[in-house]
Amino acid sequence: MGKSFANFMCKKDFHPASKSNIKKVWMAEQKISYDKKKQEELMQQYLKEQESYDNRLLMGDERVKNGLNFMYEAPPGVKKENKEKEETEGETEYKFEWQKGAPREKYAKDDMNIRDQPFGIQVRNVRCIKCHKWGHVNTDRECPLFGLSGINASSVPTDGSGPSMHPSELIAEMRNSGFALKRNVLGRNLTANDPSQDYVASDGEEDPEVEFLKSLTTKQKQKLLRKLDRLEKKKKKKKSDKKKKKLQKSKNKHKKHKKSSSSSSSSSSSSSSSSSSSSSSSSSSTSSSETDSSSESDNKEKKEKEKRKKRKKTKCSGNKSGDCKEYKSKNMLYEELSSSHSDRGKAQEKLRLLKQESSGENSTWVHSGSDRKSRSHQHSPERKGSDRNGGSRSRSRAEGSRRSRSRSPCGQKHREREARSRPHQSPSEEQKGRKGTRSHGDSEHRRERAR
């Protein structure tokens, strides 16, 4: 149980301390080193071949001159450039002066990014902006250009190897090294299109236009002046035309506004007059429509009354006197319904129902009459009594309906209308008419019995 967590994790495949991963890393390192050695050996062989080839050329061997080795030779300027690079690489640049003669280990010889920390020497990894030396800043007194501005520092004589103190060069170097001044110090960025960047004409130089005018003759100058005058006149005319058009547009707008205001006032007056005329016409039309409707209703009522009278006469002539009384009562009901109800649709429906009932009763009365004719001698006295009782019941119903009509205000109105519509008769004439109807009904009854 005393094993650590690392011992547990190194047994995993994904952990870098596992044996399989360590083996893979070692194999990759060995492969890289083998490739490097092989490339070095090939380079050494190539260099040996080149040396032998150069020696044969110096000896004046004709085979080498007539051979195809010139195809594999590098151009003549490449060797010199390679030599210069090797010389510069030999003289490495050091940040500090004490690094030139100081001994360094093998892993730190060629790498300048490694910071040395020698014993007893203060190392500041800082570079001065003015003198471009490492180990101090422009505000330190160690700097040889301390206390001098950029202009004065540029005037100070320096070695050819040292950097220049011109402000533009200093700004460029600052940018390269990662520093930058503020915009208010640099000022406005100048552009090529800026008017301050234009060339200023010297006194000796003349404008090309002036030279062209000097080269012209007097006639040509006169023609030019005429053309210029014409162009100026055309421009003036265009301006005056534009002004006139604007004035005309403004006037037209004012006129349209006035016309619209006048038309609106006239339309309001006409609308008021039309409204008054329409009101008068509507009143007249309503009055005329009312009169027409009243006249039509009167005509319809008269026609209905005439039809009912004809029906009464025909039905009374064919049936008995008791039947005639019942028909009269039903007709009275028809008249009351038509007069009492204002809605025509409802009155018509009720009239249809009553007509159907009356037609059914007529058919029953006709059948009963025929049965009486055939079986008049066979009837028992009890049947006759029952028939009489039925007739008395129908009479009592008719009398009750008449009384209810006389009591109701609608019935009184209907009677008044009938009295107006009928011609005025004396009481003696009315009695004669009643007797005539009774005698007519009795005579018909006697004829039926005789048959």
UniProtKB/Swiss-Prot annotation:
Function statement: May modulate splice site selection during alternative splicing of pre-mRNAs. Regulates transcription and acts as a corepressor for RBPJ. Recruits RBPJ to the Sin3-histone deacetylase complex (HDAC). Required for RBPJ-mediated repression of transcription.
Name of a matching Pfam family: Cir_N
KW Repressor (keyword) present: yes
Post-translational modification: Phosphorylated by NEK6.
InterPro entries attached to this UniProt entry: CIR1, CIR_N_dom
Ubl conjugation found in the keyword field: yes
Cellular component GO terms, alphabetical: centrosome; cytoplasm; nuclear speck; nucleus; protein-containing complex
Low complexity bias spans: 261-296
Record's subunit section: Interacts with RP9, SNW1, SFRS1, SFRS2,U2AF1, RBPJ, SAP30, HDAC2 NKAP and NEK6. Interacts with Epstein-Barr virus RPMS1. Component of the histone deacetylase complex. Component of the Notch corepressor complex. Interacts with NKAPL.
Region called Disordered, residue ranges: 213-451
The protein's name: Corepressor interacting with RBPJ 1
Compositionally biased residues, Polar residues: 356-367
Cross-link entry Glycyl lysine isopeptide (Lys-Gly) (interchain with G-Cter in SUMO2), positions: K79, K355
Annotated region (Interaction with RP9), positions in chain: 204-232
Motif (Nuclear localization signal): 233-247, 307-315
Location(s) in or outside the cell: Nucleus speckle; Cytoplasm, Cytoskeleton, Microtubule organizing center, Centrosome
Keyword field: Cytoplasm, Cytoskeleton, Isopeptide bond, mRNA processing, mRNA splicing, Nucleus, Phosphoprotein, Repressor, Transcription, Transcription regulation, Ubl conjugation
Ranges of biased composition (kind: Basic and acidic residues): 341-355, 369-387, 413-451
PTM sites of type Phosphoserine: S202
Principal place of residence: nucleus
Positions with biased composition (Basic residues): 233-260, 305-315
Organism in which the protein naturally occurs: Rattus norvegicus (Rat)
Chain segments carrying region Interaction with RBPJ: 1-121
GO biological process: in utero embryonic development; mRNA processing; negative regulation of DNA-templated transcription; negative regulation of transcription by RNA polymerase II; RNA splicing
Gene: Cir1
GO MF annotation: an example: histone deacetylase binding
